[in-house]
Amino acid sequence: MFSHKFICGSLTKMTETGITFDPPVYEQRYCATIQILEDARWKDQIKKVVEFGCAEMRFFQLMRRIETIEHIGLVDIDKSLLMRNLTSVNPLVSDYIRSRASPLKVQILQGNVADSSEELRDTDAVIAIELIEHVYDDVLAKIPVNIFGFMQPKLVVFSTPNSDFNVIFTRFNPLLPNGFRHEDHKFEWSRDEFKNWCLGIVEKYPNYMFSLTGVGNPPKEYESVGPVSQIAIFVRKDMLEMQLVNPLVSKPNIDKESIPYKLIHTVEYPFYVDTRTEKEKLWTEVQIELQRFKRQFESSEIEEGTYQDTCNMPIAFLLDRLEHVGATKERIEELLLENNLTVENECVLIVSSDQESEWSDPYKFSDRSSQDDALVDQEQEEERWDQGPES
């Protein structure tokens, strides 16, 4: 086994009427899974991710923000559920205003987690959040074959309820008639049962190691029962700089009994590759700050009823604004002189709007403030995808 520690915290409260988790357990699972995907040991090598049991595609709204991921496959067996939610993967206006730095292709697929299909080839990471407890034994037996035998990903994450925790739930309400937390659950494993399932997988597929963790910590007086939701992280040994036991199969055969996946929807996100030199990028930032300073100066002149042909922007102020992009006083002064701007007494002389300037490009910046406003609006729209109640 290997180790993985989550940095996100949580608070569990138990009162006379019930138990509450802050943040909700589904948010903790999402947070934990994002942290796993972004682990520095393998993040840059995770380009294609497949999520089985994607349901309403809530987790996708977080996963799509990882810039290193370039292909996401969202798989569920329920076609009607996919059809109701397929538009939620489309780019927002903000995705066009602030494009990604790398491409992102998203595919919504109808299929069974137990079936191998062409769309699953070359997958780097597999995510299955609260899925395995919903399948019957015959499907459960085929899941490792499809994922570890056919797909051979670098990383796999499973989460499932921890039945040891149910003793706390039954203090307040009985479990459902099927004996579980959800009417569609076919089983709920204890921590030992889940561990044994994982051990069976690495015994059959020795190229992998696993680590067990979880989210939704119990109250202090019940620490022995473990977390409400348990998580297994499988990592291919070469991701941990270890020798593979068996060579990878270059092109594994698709199981003849597998039903091919059906493509429901495909979308490609806008992206922009910045080919400018570092010097060109810095000059753009300098121009933006000069324009901003000039607008503020002219606005104050209008309010005070005073007008001047030039305004002086201290280089120290400019440096303070641009230090985060690697600006230095020497680099800024060099750029200013190269672009025919006058520097006197540690200040840049900026001409007023009614005078011609060699560095001024009114069309380049005229829509900047309106774009910023639009970006704020769309970021608020994005947030609603992260806040829905758990189903």
UniProtKB/Swiss-Prot annotation:
Swiss-Prot/TrEMBL catalytic activity: small RNA 3'-end nucleotide + S-adenosyl-L-methionine = small RNA 3'-end 2'-O-methylnucleotide + S-adenosyl-L-homocysteine + H(+)
Binding site for Mg(2+): 130, 133-134, 185
Cofactor note: Binds 1 Mg(2+) ion per subunit.
Listed InterPro entries: Hen1, SAM-dependent_MTases_sf
Family matches, as Gene3D superfamilies: Vaccinia Virus protein VP39 (3.40.50.150)
Biased composition (Acidic residues): 374-384
Region (Disordered): 354-391
Enzymatic class: transferase
Residues engaged in binding S-adenosyl-L-methionine: 76
EC numbers, comma separated: 2.1.1.386
GO terms for MF: metal ion binding; O-methyltransferase activity; RNA binding; RNA methyltransferase activity; small RNA 2'-O-methyltransferase activity
Domain of life assignment: Eukaryota
GO biological process, one term: RNA methylation
GO terms under cellular component: cytoplasm; nucleus
UniProt keyword terms in alphabetical order: Magnesium, Metal-binding, Methyltransferase, RNA-binding, RNA-mediated gene silencing, S-adenosyl-L-methionine, Transferase
Cofactor(s) the protein needs: Mg(2+)
PANTHER family (UniProt xref): HEN1, SMALL RNA 2'-O-METHYLTRANSFERASE
Family in the record: Belongs to the methyltransferase superfamily. HEN1 family.
Function: Methyltransferase that adds a 2'-O-methyl group at the 3'-end of selected small RNAs. Mediates 2'-O-methylation of piRNAs, single-stranded siRNAs and long hairpin RNA genes (hpRNAs). Methylation protects the 3'-end of small RNAs from tailing and trimming and could constitute a recognition signal for appropriate argonaute machineries.
Name this protein carries in UniProt: Small RNA 2'-O-methyltransferase
Species assigned in the record: Drosophila melanogaster (Fruit fly)
Taxonomic placement: Eukaryota, Metazoa, Ecdysozoa, Arthropoda, Hexapoda
